[in-house]
Every structure is written in C-alpha cells, then in structure tokens.
C-alpha cells in the first residue's frame, strides 16, 4: 500500500482494522469505504462469480409495512463473523466464507404499527477491553431499531446482554415528547468511541412545527447508563411554538485519536416553511464536532442556512488528509463538497456566501445568502424551460410548460404558493450512500441523483380541498400538513407524460469521481463521471439510486444502488464499467469487501426499496473469484 494510503487510514482511526476486515459501517471510523485488498483487481474482476447467497426471510410474514421496507444494510466483518441487520431490525451472524447462519436475533418489531421508515443500515461492534477472553458479552453487537430501542447483543451467541439497560435494551423514547410513536426511530448504526455508544434519531418529516427534538445521546457500552446528551437547536427551547428535529439520522464518524465524533444534522421542523423558526437555525444542516467523552461542542459548520428545501446532511462525514492537514469532507444533497480542518472546522479551500432570492410567501424570511465552494458541484444545480426533456416532442413540450409555470431561480429558490423547482431535489445530490475516499488516486467517489422536485405551499384553509382533488386525479405526490404553520406543503418529483419519466436530461443518476487536487490551472474538476444503472429497460442510462460506493486498492469501485438489480464494478482511474452481475433484487445498499482464508469476497444486501419501487427481496449475496 502506498504511504499516503496508510497515512489517511491511520488518521481516520482505522489502525485496529486488519487489511481483510470491515469492522465498521464505512470500514473504518472515518467512513472512507476504502479497502487495501488487491486480490480482485481490474484484470480479473470479470471472473467474479456468486460464492454464496443467504436469504433473511425478513419479509415474512407479509405485512403492509413490506411496501415501504428497504434493505439498506452494509454488513460488517468483526472477529471472524459477518453481522448484518434487516429492515425489521433482525440481527444475523453469518460464516463469512460460506454464508451459513451462526445465529439470528429478532427484536419482535410490531408489524401492525405504522412507522415512518422501515429500514436499518447496519450494526456496530465493540470488544470490551476489560472483559476476559470468552466472557459473556465481551464482544457486543449494537443496533438501533425502528421502534426506538438501543439493543446490545453477545457477538458469539446473539443473546441480549442483560447488564445493558433493561435486559439488553434501552427505550430511547424515554424523556422524548413524542408526537407520533412511529415517527421517532433509529435507522443508522450507532458510533462507538472508547466505551461509549453514540446515537442519533430518525424523525418523520413535514408533520408539524413542534416535533420531537433531535438530541444526540451517548450511553455506557457496558451498562447502558446515559453519559451525555447534545441538543442541535438549544435556541428552540425559548420559541413558541417550539421547532423540533434537526436530528442526526445518518451515520456519524469518529477520530478516536483526537477524541472527536463528527455528526451530520438535518433540517429543523417543518422542512419547507421557516416562518416559525427565524434565523439561520444553527446547528441544523451542519456537521458538528463534539468531544466524544463529554458531548461538548468543539466546532460546527453549517452548509445550509435556514433550510427550506429538506437539504439534510445525509452523508457520513469522510475523514481524510487534505493539504497535509487532518480533514473531514462534508458531502451534501446539493452536490457541494466542503473539506474542513478536522480540529477547527475551518474550510481548507475557498468558500463564500452568495446572495440568494428572497421568499415571496407572507410570513417567510429566507436567509439572504448561502455558501458556495471551490470544489466543482457533483450535480447540476439549476434548470430552466430550455432544459426540458422527453422521449417525444409532445412530452418535452409538456415538461417545458410545467417548468415555465414554476418559480425557478436556481438551487436555493424558496418554496412558493405557485410551486418552486428544487434542483437538486431533496433526495440529492448525494444522500446517505455517502462517498468513498481513494487515497492512492486522491479521489472522492459518490453516487448522485439528478432528479429535480417541485414543492408548493398550500394555505391551511385550502388543504382539505387540495387533498380531495389529488385523490380524484390520482396524483402521486406527497402532502405534508406542517401543523402549526400557516401552510401545508405538496411535493412531487419532476416527472411527467404517460410514462412518468423525468423532465430532465439523462442520466438521472451517475457515479462521479471528484479530484481532490486542483488541475494545472488551479481549478477543481471531476476526474470522471458515468451513468449508473437503468431506470427501466429501453430508457437512456442513469437511474435514481440509493446506496453508496466502495473503493479498493485493486483499482475498483463497487456499487449497486440503482433501480435495476445489478452490482457493478468501475475502473477507478477512468470510470469505465468493467463488470456487472445480476442480483435477486435491487441493491439499495452499500457493498463491502473482506478476506478470509486467503480469499477476497464482495458482499451486497439485495432486498430492494419499497419507496423507490425497485424489485424487492431478502438476499445477501457474496462474490469471489473462481478456483
């Protein structure tokens, strides 16, 4: 491995991970998604075949929740076992060489309840350095559940660790002013620093001004005792009505050597109207660095002021070395990348506040400026009528007329009563799939979406009539009541015509590689970009996608994520797709790779995504080279 690669991984706190391991969600605590394995490379990747397949049976018995279930998990390899979670928070331990089940734990999620999200992105592992070898619960697997529990399991047996909380679990709803029981959840694996388990929460959007608070909590990994809390919007306590959320629902990163945890936060409630939460709304829409031991704020960097567009920081912060400084990269739904000094939060490149259009909605006061960055955006950030697209001229003209009817003055155009074009849409840009960092080629690699959305504010007194009309016309957008605000909202993707195709030029999804070094003229550039998958047969390439990439020292980028059911490999230097394999279902997850007994495997959870409308299933598929 090159010296730079070693330097980056050590800085990210991954020294304890062997080359063949994948012991954390992003492989290392810094979320680089970089593996030093080289057995599978550009010369032999076409010889990959299915080594084993495991079926979780998570969708049994059939329930209405299956319609929104999403198998988004990335397995981890820890102390010789492969651990993963299902959309219903079952935790499974597998033999990494054969896929044979070692144990399975079921938390008995109530499948007749209504949950905002039905997913789990994975589990976290911890070995107690004070416990004797072979002791019960010396190795622990932690999962946060969609019914808001934090559970600790014995890594060897899958049985709950009785000394943690109450019989192995903590009820995370205690002390929370719940508005709706199924809208306060945990969907991402917790972060572990020393003997602390640190977790955020997933809070259902667009329901009301007064929502649950997005407080981050740290618990003792042995006992479950609460050690500290951190409130992302402490100023909201003094407001009437009190805004909520600003929750950290994505995956955190940690620099264990510096004792720091990096937390991505979402928008304050409600997402699309801020008249009840004046100001810049710090520390919503930010990456914050906390002292892991105490929860004390070290610094904060806000990427969107007074968010009106649902531009949460969804991606896991990526730890890397930049200009010979320990850094953290913030990858956003807007397609912007910010690289900050890990110790101070100061940008390590040029950023600036740019003037933005004002709101024309009574009661709203949009923030007058938003940040721009030296790095080239990963996705388009504006669209006009001339950019309308359709398979036929009639479809293109229909899309053009729709765009002409909207308020569309660039990325940060505030929501309006007539309808505003959101470019990019609220799914990104880059979502929770995050980025992979290749230290050998100085690349930041991410999956991106290029589908604008339309959002329209609805005066409260007109909401019932609008909902009735939408039912009559079979409209498939989403209403958000935003109770407590003078306006509800309606949003929908910018798709039209008889085939419900995007009104934007393809590709509608792409994988991109951002060069972390400037070109000869000092400019930022994309080293390459390539369409990712297909939305449907017969359409141009480039699919909506949810999930992320990984990168290996073998010169390969692996990703699934697209709506079609394939795992793909790309050449890290050129972006050329050089291999793909069909999966039993779509892979709306991030793959991982590891080596056992001298053989490298690439594993993906292929279970589809109910909300995306992709092919559903319950498979975990491992690929390896033939004998």
Regions found by a protein language model. Give the residues of each.
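Hard-cation-handling environments
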Residues: 428
